[in-house]
């Protein structure tokens, strides 16, 4: 992951290009989330403590985990994807905890009680976990979004990708 790659802001809604597959839309969200974290890391390394890129990326990642657990994984569990889905759910819990840790440190950065090196380490940890997770999820799980989901499940996932919002207070089960 390069800090020099262009970043795309993560929004609460992802516009799906009409010819875009579900796999492509899900991967695009991954790139935007990674880009937000990378942008924050780059700024922090230069002495800029603007939290917006990290806050947006964490909000986007939480929403992304929700959409996978609510819309993508349930129908895939009914196929032969039980073991890979189990791994993804476990890793979602690890990612959620890493986001919580980074968010706590971000609050401490606001009052300057957390140093930049600690914050950078937390962000790199989150990015490393994301890289490991995405390297499995993208080639194994995401192709099934287009191949194995029913038309109604695909439509529901596409609609959420375009305009869905995570319920307030939702936490992935593996983080509880």
Where are the regions a protein language model picked out?
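Small-residue-biased structural context
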Residues: 1-176
């Amino acid at each position: 992951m390069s800090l020099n790659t262009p970043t795309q802001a993560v929004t609460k809604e992802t516009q799906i290009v009409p010819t875009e597959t579900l796999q492509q839309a899900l991967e695009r969200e991954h790139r935007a989330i990674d880009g937000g974290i990378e942008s924050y890391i780059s700024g922090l390394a230069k002495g800029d403590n603007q939290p917006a890129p990290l806050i947006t990326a964490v909000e986007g990642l939480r929403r992304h985990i929700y959409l996978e657990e609510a819309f993508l994984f349930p129908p895939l569990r009914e196929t032969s994807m039980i073991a890979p889905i189990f791994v993804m759910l476990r890793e979602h819990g690890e990612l959620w905890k890493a986001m919580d840790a980074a968010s706590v440190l971000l609050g401490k950065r606001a009052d300057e009680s957390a140093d930049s090196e600690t914050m950078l380490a937390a962000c790199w940890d989150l990015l490393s976990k994301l890289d490991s997770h995405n390297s499995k999820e993208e080639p194994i799980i995401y192709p099934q979004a287009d191949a194995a989901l029913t038309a109604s499940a695909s439509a529901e996932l596409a609609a959420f990708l375009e305009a869905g919002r995570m319920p307030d207070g939702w936490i992935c089960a593996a983080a509880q």
